[in-house]
Amino acid sequence: MRLIKLHHLRPAPGSRRARVRVGRGEGSKGKTAGRGTKGTKARAPVRPGFAGGQIPLHMSIPKLKGFKNHKKVEYSVISIKRLCEAYPSGGVVTRDNVMSVIGKKRGFVKLLSDGEVTVKFDITVDKASAAAVEKITSAAGTVTQAR
């Protein structure tokens, strides 16, 4: 039995086609090399984005205007209704508890007044609307705002 080595490996006959070398002499793919005669496509390739004499798309679309405020503070909001669903017995609710209800790990939290309060809450959030504070304090609870 003969030992097979890497240099013995060959592709199966007919599985590989030879690369066509164009533009070499006057044969079938010679002279114009399958590009036809004359014209832009026979000469140099057209650059990407070239629109053939009309204004290109990247020049016809307006530039962005204005600016992006990098100091903008975005709040994740939670309503009183959702808070009551998560904590039906009320009690002390920290900012981290609220973040776990929202499903986020970082950022700021704002409490909104959508819904009715039936139990006492002692809640700590970054911000709360005036109506939300009024609803919770009317149910004998407290709201501590961190910001």
UniProtKB/Swiss-Prot annotation:
Pfam family, one: Ribosomal_L27A
Record-level Gene Ontology MF annotations: rRNA binding; structural constituent of ribosome
One GO location term (cellular component): cytosolic large ribosomal subunit
UniProt region (Disordered), positions on chain: 1-49
Keywords for this protein: Ribonucleoprotein, Ribosomal protein, RNA-binding, rRNA-binding
Keyword Ribosomal protein found: yes
Gene Ontology annotations of biological process type: translation
Disulfide bonds: none
Residue spans of biased composition, Basic residues class: 1-22
Function: Binds to the 23S rRNA.
Subunit structure: Part of the 50S ribosomal subunit.
PANTHER family in UniProt: 50S RIBOSOMAL PROTEIN L15, LARGE RIBOSOMAL SUBUNIT PROTEIN UL15M
Family membership noted in the UniProt record: Belongs to the universal ribosomal protein uL15 family.
Name of the protein in its database record: Large ribosomal subunit protein uL15
Organism: Tropheryma whipplei (strain Twist)
Lineage: Bacteria, Bacillati, Actinomycetota, Actinomycetes, Micrococcales
Gene: rplO
